[in-house]
């Protein structure tokens, strides 16, 4: 079996481009969800608000400007084939790409070197890197910038198994209720169910990488996604909290096996600017 060589410089170049693209161009599925919401929204103020969000997207894409002033933490996901060898340091390559991308596009630097001493690193590094080993020789990079307004509204709980699916529904709806207008709705929810405390949180983040027009492959969870989406939109919070039928654009659930005595649930809240961009090197 042959090994494919990937130069670390190629990874740096890809990450640089993806940081810029993710911050200036919304993924087609999220943009389509916004367009669909605008077409279906019956409340005049909500419809007007959605129209302003659409206009903002167009200006950002046309002028290569950030969609939002919070250009986020650089969350980088790499699907790395087991038959790939990287010539160079992967972590350094990713961080250099983030550094260049945020500098080149004049994106806001939002990372502190220490969570309590609060000294800004000045270049939006370090990136938050997750590597998934997969079969083959693929090297797929996804950059998903994540802003603090929605991240701060995210929650995790350790339910009792007896709480069951109703406990999951209640926790998700309570999370949205507590968040209110803070995460700049219409929101997107990444939900992790199962695993361990740490794996569940990572699973919720991973769920945000799935296109909104691709429901869970398991019909049971696909139905739960739809049920939660309808319930959240029935709250009437609406775009930016001004009221309306569009509080949420999509719910994406990912699930894992778990301990017989556990039922972890994590909700990673994302704003209407759910950013991600991918490339293979």
Task: Give the residues covered by each predicted segment.
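Non-transmembrane, aqueous-exposed alpha-helical and coiled segments at domain scale
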Residues: 1-281
């Amino acid at each position: 079996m042959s090994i494919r060589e990937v130069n670390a410089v190629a990874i740096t170049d890809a990450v640089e481009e993806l940081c810029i693209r993710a911050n200036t161009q919304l993924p087609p599925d999220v943009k389509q969800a916004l367009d669909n919401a605008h077409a279906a929204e019956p409340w005049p103020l909500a419809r007007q608000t959605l129209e302003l969000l659409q206009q903002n997207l167009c200006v950002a894409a046309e002028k290569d400007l950030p969609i939002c002033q919070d250009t986020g933490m650089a969350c980088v996901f790499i699907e790395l084939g087991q038959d790939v060898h990287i010539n160079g340091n992967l972590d350094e390559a990713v961080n250099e790409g983030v550094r260049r991308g945020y500098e080149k596009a004049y994106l806001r630097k939002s990372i502190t070197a220490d969570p309590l001493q609060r000294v800004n690193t000045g270049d939006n590094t370090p990136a938050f890197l997750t590597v998934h080993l997969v079969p083959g020789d693929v090297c797929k990079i996804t950059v998903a910038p994540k802003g603090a307004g929605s991240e701060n509204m995210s929650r995790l709980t350790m339910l009792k198994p007896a709480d069951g699916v109703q406990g999951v529904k209640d926790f998700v709806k309570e999370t949205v209720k507590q968040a209110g207008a803070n995460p700049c709705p219409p929101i997107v929810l990444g939900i992790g169910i199962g695993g361990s405390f740490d794996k569940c949180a990572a699973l919720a983040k991973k769920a945000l990488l799935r296109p909104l027009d691709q429901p869970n492959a398991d019909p049971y969870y696909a139905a739960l996604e739809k049920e939660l989406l309808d319930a959240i939109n029935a709250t009437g919070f609406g775009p930016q909290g001004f009221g309306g039928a569009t509080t949420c654009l999509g719910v994406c659930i990912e699930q894992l096996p778990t301990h017989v005595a556990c039922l972890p649930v994590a909700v990673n809240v994302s704003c209407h600017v759910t950013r991600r961009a991918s490339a293979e090197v």
